[in-house]
Amino acid sequence: MPKPDIHPTWYPDAKVICNGEVVMTTGSTQPEIHVDVWSGNHPFFTGTQKILDTEGRVDRFMKKYGMGQKKSGDKAKAEAKADAKS
């Protein structure tokens, strides 16, 4: 026989809340579940793509490793010759 009063309360109609509105109901041990992202607003499921570069990380990377800059001098000439051969 299982021990009485050791199991949590089961809520068969627990509300899942995202941005202040109920998006679905499910069974849970909590009456309300607050989430930030769900399938209705996640870019993978909605088909939209958002690229946020708020801190300029890509630009900082390009500057740090010298990508995107024009090549000059002997290296540029050597690479031009290599490209011409292929």
From Swiss-Prot:
**Gene3D superfamilies assigned:** Ribosomal protein L31
Asked whether the UniProt record includes Ribonucleoprotein among its keywords, one would answer: yes
* Cellular compartments per GO CC: ribonucleoprotein complex; ribosome
| Key words, A-Z | Ribonucleoprotein, Ribosomal protein, RNA-binding, rRNA-binding
**The keyword Ribosomal protein appears for this protein:** yes
InterPro entries xref list: Ribosomal_bL28/bL31-like_sf, Ribosomal_bL31, Ribosomal_bL31_A, Ribosomal_bL31_sf
> What's a Pfam family in this record?
Ribosomal_L31
**Which GO molecular function annotation, any one, does this entry have?**
structural constituent of ribosome
Any one of the GO BP annotations: translation
What is known about what this protein does? Binds the 23S rRNA.
Recorded family membership: Belongs to the bacterial ribosomal protein bL31 family. Type A subfamily.
Assembly description: Part of the 50S ribosomal subunit.
Query: Protein name, please?
Result: Large ribosomal subunit protein bL31
- The encoding gene: rpmE
